[in-house]
Amino acid sequence: MDPNCSCTTGVSCACTGSCTCKECKCTSCKKSCCSCCPVGCAKCAHGCVCKGTLENCSCCA
């Protein structure tokens, strides 16, 4: 398991294609971990908090 990922399911944290970890901290995460973040937001992989589906998350405001 990747030490940077809090996800308990799966052998490793493979965030490159589909990040399903709500608290994914993978540096290799190339997809936003929450739906309100743009795909290019790297900070979304580090403790992103969504306020709503149509709003920006706290790290991408």
Swiss-Prot record:
Binding-site list for a divalent metal cation 3: C15, C19, C24, C29
Entry keyword set: Cadmium, Copper, Metal-binding, Metal-thiolate cluster, Zinc
Molecular-function GO terms, alphabetical: metal ion binding; zinc ion binding
Binding site for a divalent metal cation 5: C34, C36, C37, C50
Protein residues bound to a divalent metal cation 6: C37, C41, C44, C60
Record region (Alpha): 30-61
Record-listed a divalent metal cation 4 binding positions: C33, C34, C44, C48
Residues that hold a divalent metal cation 1 according to the record: C5, C7, C21, C24
Residues that bind a divalent metal cation 7: C50, C57, C59, C60
Pfam families: Metallothio (PF00131)
Region (Beta): 1-29
Free-text domain note: Class I metallothioneins contain 2 metal-binding domains: four divalent ions are chelated within cluster A of the alpha domain and are coordinated via cysteinyl thiolate bridges to 11 cysteine ligands. Cluster B, the corresponding region within the beta domain, can ligate three divalent ions to 9 cysteines.
Role of this protein: Metallothioneins have a high content of cysteine residues that bind various heavy metals; these proteins are transcriptionally regulated by both heavy metals and glucocorticoids.
Sequence similarity: Belongs to the metallothionein superfamily. Type 1 family.
Protein name: Metallothionein-1M
